[in-house]
């Protein structure tokens, strides 16, 4: 049985008041968390369920929690399982970002907020998704590749590295490491790790993170500060510190409905903040504030300098070094080939200078479209290419898999192809959606699904129909 730390109970009750705290405690100890997903609008047209009110275009509450692991369309990136409170970032982006921007998600793993942000950003924007912890950065890269949008760069760096890089951003999301009080309901381990000392360590670290990244935010730029915790030390007090020490201004969001039951400032200060409390609002714990840096923001596409004196043709770029194979990608974008450790990428040409600056100064894990690996006998197509929204799938032979065969494929088991399947690389699909590659060598086919991504469970729940593809 869950037991909440006494220091947490005493402090939080004093902060929230008896009534609000009792609703929180009851939710943590007695209630099931709601199940919600967010669809990928670049791959998916709709989903079952009730719209999440602060993210109505892509967020959905589900009435039950299905076995998501056994839905091939989850692995194909058509949707992401995300608790509803975290989708509030969608509202912030849509309200404050009306023109193309360059944005940084500084502490992005596992990628839920990054993919939510990418879906909400105006076309022509570039998103850097960064995770400082090496072990967590790989799952971030995986989820970004499944999402499949080309205007994203994934890095594994500390804030100080970005400071040295001289890259400048219009918007920065700092979903900072925290004491995790908002995770108590769904993660009992978070309860065991909580302590007042950890809270103290966190609020100090959070200030260091914001301070380190502040110079990377352009004058007039937007900082979205968020935690998944409740205490004011990591929340309101840090927002107040950002205003006092760094000169930021707290901004309000319009259209936040009273029926959403989002709790506002609990410290008596008058700046607007947004706190999601389980048992009060329909989601897990989240705190968010929108801050504006002093100065005038200079409007315009972040890629405008890269477009000067460029020809307006749509041809795939070619030249010395790696090349992008003809026909692999949609040709409504000008592509620049790039290579790193035998892996070839296609970078949208408008980001050439920015990508080169990132590659020079940061540890780039993924950028644009990951095409494949060059072993000297031509490119072996990568899983990320199969899941990219830029894939020209009609260029490749395709085999539609049954549900059972799709699950076998995602377990990296052998899947037989029809006898008339051409030799070479074959795009396998499920419900007409690409899920990966096989190499047909005649008497058998090699499953090219990434070993580290495979489904490990032998259990199967049966075919799911949660979302509808484009």
Annotate each PLM feature:
Residues 169, 222-225, 230-353:
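Class I S-adenosyl-L-methionine
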Residues 56-95, 450:
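Class I SAM-dependent transferase core
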Residues 130-167, 174:
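S-adenosyl-L-methionine
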Residues 110-123:
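Conserved SAM-binding loop of SAM-dependent methyltransferases across substrates and taxa
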Residues 1-45, 63, 294-470:
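Polybasic, low-complexity RNA-engagement segments
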Residues 135, 170-211, 228-236:
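Mobile active-site "lid"/loop adjacent to the S-adenosyl-L-methionine
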Residues 122, 217-219:
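Helix-to-beta-strand junctions that scaffold the AdoMet/dcAdoMet cofactor pocket
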Residues 99-109:
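Conserved class I S-adenosyl-L-methionine
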């Amino acid at each position: 049985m869950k037991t909440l730390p006494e220091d947490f109970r005493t402090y939080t009750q004093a902060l929230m008041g008896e009534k609000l705290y009792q609703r929180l405690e009851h939710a943590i100890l007695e209630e099931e968390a709601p199940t919600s997903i967010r669809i990928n609008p670049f791959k998916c047209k709709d989903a079952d369920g009730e719209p999440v009110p602060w993210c109505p275009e892509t967020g959905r509450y589900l009435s039950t929690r299905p076995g998501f692991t056994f839905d091939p369309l989850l692995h194909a990136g058509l949707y992401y399982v995300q608790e509803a409170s975290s989708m509030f970032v969608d509202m912030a982006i849509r309200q404050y970002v009306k023109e193309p921007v360059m944005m940084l998600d500084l502490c992005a793993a596992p990628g839920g907020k990054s993919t939510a942000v990418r879906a909400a950003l105006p076309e022509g924007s570039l998103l850097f998704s960064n995770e400082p912890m090496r072990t967590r950065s790989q799952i971030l890269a995986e989820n970004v590749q499944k999402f499949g949008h080309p205007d994203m760069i994934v890095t594994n760096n500390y804030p100080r590295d970005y400071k040295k890089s001289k890259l400048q951003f219009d918007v920065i999301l700092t979903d900072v490491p925290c004491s995790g009080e908002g995770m108590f309901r769904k993660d009992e381990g978070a309860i065991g790790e909580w302590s007042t000392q950890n809270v103290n360590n966190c609020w100090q670290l959070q200030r260091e993170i914001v301070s380190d990244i502040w110079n990377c935010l352009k004058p007039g730029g937007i900082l979205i500060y968020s935690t998944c915790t409740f205490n004011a030390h990591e929340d309101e007090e840090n927002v107040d510190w950002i205003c006092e020490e760094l000169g930021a201004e707290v901004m309000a969001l319009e259209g936040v409905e009273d029926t959403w039951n989002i709790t506002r400032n609990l410290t008596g200060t008058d700046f607007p903040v947004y706190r999601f409390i389980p048992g009060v609002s329909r989601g897990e714990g989240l705190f968010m504030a929108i801050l504006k840096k002093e100065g005038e923001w200079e409007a315009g596409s972040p890629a405008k300098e890269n477009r000067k004196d460029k020809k307006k043709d749509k041809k795939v770029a070619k030249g010395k070094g790696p090349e992008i194979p003809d026909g692999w990608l949609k040709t409504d974008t000008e592509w620049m080939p790039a290579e790193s450790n035998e892996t070839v990428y296609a970078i949208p040409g408008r980001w050439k200078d920015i990508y080169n600056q990132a590659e020079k100064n940061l540890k780039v894990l993924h950028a644009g479209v990951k095409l494949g690996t060059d072993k000297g006998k031509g490119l072996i197509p990568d899983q990320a290419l199969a899941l990219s929204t830029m894939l020209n799938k009609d260029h490749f032979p395709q085999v539609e898999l049954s549900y059972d065969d799709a699950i076998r494929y995602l377990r990296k088991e052998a899947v037989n192809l029809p006898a008339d399947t051409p030799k070479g690389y074959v795009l396998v699909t499920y419900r007409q959606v690409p899920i990966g590659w096989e190499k047909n060598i005649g008497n058998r086919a090699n499953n090219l699904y990434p070993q580290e991504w495979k489904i490990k469970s032998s259990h199967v729940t049966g075919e799911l129909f949660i979302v509808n593809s484009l």
